[in-house]
Amino acid sequence: MASLKDVAKLANVSLMTVSRALNNPERLKPETLARVQQAIEQTSYVPDLSAKKIRGAHASPKTIGVLALDTVTTPFSVEITLSIEETARMHGWNSFVMNMFTDDNPDTIVDLLLSHRPDGIIYTTMGLRQVPLPAKLLTLPCVLANCESIDEQVASYIPDDEQGQYAAVQALLAEGYRQPLCLHLPADHLATTRRRQGLERACREAGLDPDTLEHSYMASGDEHYRDI
């Protein structure tokens, strides 16, 4: 991650000048300010909001920054963030959550997250999905929770939807049910495809054609349960 010194070196100015550009830009000449701002953009520098530390103080615990995309809407998603915090504390780490919503500017939220200088990142979402990863996140150790990266090779911790559905349908068929109603998440959800694979595997192992069952796909959230 770029430092204040990197910006100063690229702009060919002093550290004080960079500091003034960030905190008191009106005190600089327009051409100097423009040069510093260009260097900040080129180095992807993010100001350090946690820099006010007493010199010589004991090292503070390491910190995990949790970037939470649409994960404050259900008990399941809240449980994810609470579990992260509890596990971090068990190992002597701190954690903080930065919420991001679909209409937010990702670059702005990521810059705010990184300005707190976390030692690592957990990117979590509500509902299993594939996500694009802002390049700045990959300047730190980063893992994904309940989501997968579209392009980058990043460790992901996700539910085993295929195996879970397989076990559930297998148990149902073992009780003698041969015509269960199959209620699915919306067809375009990533978890839907994997759960359908588990269902089909369990049915075929039991000699049952899954295509003969009645399948209904949710269209607009929980309201579809009432329709059925």
PLM features: residue spans?
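Extreme N-terminal segment that seeds HTH/winged-HTH DNA-binding domains in transcriptional regulators
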Residues: M1-L15
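Short conserved active-site loop signatures built around small residues
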Residues: V36
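Bacterial carbohydrate/catabolite-sensing allosteric modules
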Residues: E41-Q42, L49, S83-N94, L137-L144, ...
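Periplasmic-binding protein-like
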Residues: V66, R117-T125, L181-H184
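Short, well-structured alpha-helical segments in soluble
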Residues: N105-D119, H224-I228
